[in-house]
Amino acid sequence: MASLYLNSLLPLPPSHPQKLLEPSSSSLLSTSNGNELALKPIVINGDPPTFVSAPARRIVAVGDLHGDLGKARDALQLAGVLSSDGRDQWVGQDTVLVQVGDILDRGDDEIAILSLLRSLDDQAKANGGAVFQVNGNHETMNVEGDFRYVDARAFDECTDFLDYLEDYAQDWDKAFRNWIFESRQWKEDRRSSQTYWDQWNVVKRQKGVIARSVLLRPGGRLACELSRHGVILRVNNWLFCHGGLLPHHVAYGIERINREVSTWMRSPTNYEDSPQMPFIATRGYDSVVWSRLYSRETSELEDYQIEQVNKILHDTLEAVGAKAMVVGHTPQLSGVNCEYGCGIWRVDVGMSSGVLDSRPEVLEIRGDKARVIRSNRDRLHELQVADYI
């Protein structure tokens, strides 16, 4: 029944006003006859962004980062969008970068990574590009107050960041953008002042938990920052989400899901009419951020199960007008890969030192074609490319 209903759906134009990102004057597209044409602007629909038209842009997808700033930089440099001189400059020109969630937990530089992506987005827009994020299950868990997977040093970063905000007279935007350039010094200062007994300091740890709660509870400054991003994003005819989009999500409404998650994140919970955590997006094995339906190894499935998953995937893609879906969430021991006729791409390689500590890999998309970019196993500065149709 779900597939019949899905086949009757059309990807209707979003109702939200459009935002235009104008390419820089130097952004030119070379045609087959040697002429150069100016790129069309990027058009964003939805709040948070849900549907993006990025004509003739190169798209790069990066998987789960889990608080590892070093690996995040490696991945972004591998993607060709981050400078390698330590200045954290955007060098991707008009590239569109999409990070598919799970920046939080398991590492100690979470806010620094979020700050880096915001800084790169500002720089990218000036060059006709853009940076997008979708929230993962670890973002929604933290806004819910579930800190089970937080690295002890990440609590310290939250404490430092709250103290740092005082230097900016609570000017959030300026402080947040600059944290990537300041966080290293704060981290070094903290390390130099620590003693062996600090790890057993209950008061210090409690202070970190309180700082994290202040920042990430619904309505908190960092929760509001996360609310700028949805859990589902379509760029051209490519769909991005953390766990996986399913037929009942499409029937419920993609924009509606994004809007409800965003509203929940930015709304304080101390009111009777405060919005509840959107279950369809954030809770349960079949929610947008938790689903692993498309990420299981097909070798573990029976033929009839593979057929079922394949039908669910392609019905979903047809309903939203997408060629393929890109997901994170489940580390892929074989690296970035595709299944079901390359209708699904799995880009979480467990690169964070808090997960598998594997070498970064990224997915590059040009038009309807995608390829995996990975570093050479022996020499990091050499790149290997695996092409897919």
UniProtKB/Swiss-Prot annotation:
InterPro entries: Calcineurin-like_PHP_ApaH, Metallo-depent_PP-like, MPP_Shelphs. Keywords: Chloroplast, Hydrolase, Manganese, Metal-binding, Plastid, Protein phosphatase, Transit peptide. Its cofactor is Mn(2+). One of its GO terms (molecular function) is phosphatase activity. Mn(2+) 1 binds at D64, H66, D102. Transmembrane segments: none annotated. The active site is at H138 (proton donor). Induction: Circadian-regulated, with a peak in expression at 8 hours light time on a 12 hours light/dark cycle (at protein level). Induced by heat shock. Down-regulated by infection with the bacterial pathogen P.syringae. Residues 1-53 form a transit peptide. Disruption phenotype: No visible phenotype under normal growth conditions. Its main location: plastid. This is Shewanella-like protein phosphatase 1.
